[in-house]
């Protein structure tokens, strides 16, 4: 029988949210559920809320963790210090007493972070799920954000955020009113810091694009057939070059796969998780 103290600990463990001071910054996080840690990493300009349909669903079987990256959502803005998102994530997990290998689910920028994390901390990574992913070192052919950064510097962050929301990368998502509204709420809330300042992912070069073959964690690569060509190319290359990777293409789905098609996304993620080896 559990003691009263243990009961309290388990209750907190099941549902917790707040901020942690780690790596010289303040990071917002939420935890729900028990079991193997399942960590959700959001995309550029978005925040932890993009994972609503996954966070609550998978918390029935996993200890789900989601966060706002430095400069996004409810986390603190960056200063002048050097930092990386993957180091921030590792520090946050340690501060939450999560010391066993984790399953990382990252969307776009979040996928880039998941790859970097897995390369730098392989013993701390059980598996990675790359959704419409970016990978550091890939040179985009069509998806270029220089114009967006220039608009932010010339016409202001709010103007640049409106232009970003109107970008073709969100075209399929904008056709779905609830998804479109949820995306705009996050983009509107976004600080815009990275539009006018140094981007953290450039502060450490892990040569991820050249080192995909060195990834050892089980990997799911998932993208929508309506995504932009660059992201489809990245996903195809990742699925081909990462040893044993599984590839899933969701039909009639664009860049924001988990929000545009949550039922199919959750099914594919659940199938992948169920097939992972049990420690």
Regions found by a protein language model. Give the residues of each.
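Active-site loop/oxyanion-hole signature of alpha/beta-hydrolase fold enzymes
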Residues: 32, 53-56, 65-105, 267
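Active-site glycine-rich loops that stabilize anionic/oxyanionic intermediates
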Residues: 35, 43-46, 108
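Serine-hydrolase catalytic-loop signature spanning alpha/beta hydrolases and amidase-signature enzymes
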Residues: 43-53, 64
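Gly/Ala-rich beta-loop-alpha elbow adjacent to hydrolase catalytic centers
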Residues: 106-110, 114
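Flexible "cap/lid" loop of the alpha/beta hydrolase fold
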Residues: 115-120, 125-156
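Conserved alpha/beta-hydrolase catalytic His-Asp/Glu region
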Residues: 139-141, 154-213
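Conserved serine/cysteine hydrolase catalytic core
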Residues: 195-240
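Catalytic active-site module of serine/aspartate enzymes centered on a nucleophile-bearing elbow/loop
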Residues: 245-279
């Amino acid at each position: 029988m559990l003691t009263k103290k243990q009961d309290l600990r388990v209750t907190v463990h099941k549902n917790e949210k707040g901020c942690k001071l780690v790596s010289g910054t303040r990071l917002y996080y939420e935890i729900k559920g028990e079991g193997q840690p399942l960590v959700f990493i959001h995309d550029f300009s978005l925040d932890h809320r993009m994972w609503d349909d996954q966070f609550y669903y998978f918390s029935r079987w996993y200890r789900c963790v989601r966060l706002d990256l430095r400069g996004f959502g409810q986390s603190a803005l960056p200063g002048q210090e050097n930092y990386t998102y993957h180091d921030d994530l590792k520090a946050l997990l340690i501060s939450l007493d999560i010391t066993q290998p984790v399953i990382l689910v990252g969307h776009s920028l979040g996928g880039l972070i998941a790859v970097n994390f897995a390369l730098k901390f392989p013993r701390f990574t059980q598996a990675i799920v790359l959704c419409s992913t970016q990978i550091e070192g890939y040179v985009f052919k069509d998806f270029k954000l220089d114009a967006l950064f220039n608009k932010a510097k010339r016409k202001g962050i709010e103007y640049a955020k409106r232009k970003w929301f109107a970008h073709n990368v969100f075209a399929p998502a904008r056709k779905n009113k609830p998804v479109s509204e949820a995306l705009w709420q996050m983009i509107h809330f976004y600080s815009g810091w990275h539009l006018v300042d140094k981007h953290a992912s450039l502060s450490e070069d892990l040569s991820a694009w050249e080192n995909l073959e060195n990834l050892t964690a089980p990997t799911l690569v998932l993208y929508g057939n309506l995504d932009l060509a660059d992201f489809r190319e990245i996903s195809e290359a990742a699925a081909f070059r990462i040893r044993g990777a599984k590839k899933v293409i969701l039909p009639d789905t664009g860049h924001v796969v988990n929000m545009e098609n949550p039922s199919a996304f959750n099914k594919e993620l659940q199938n992948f998780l169920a097939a992972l080896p049990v420690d």
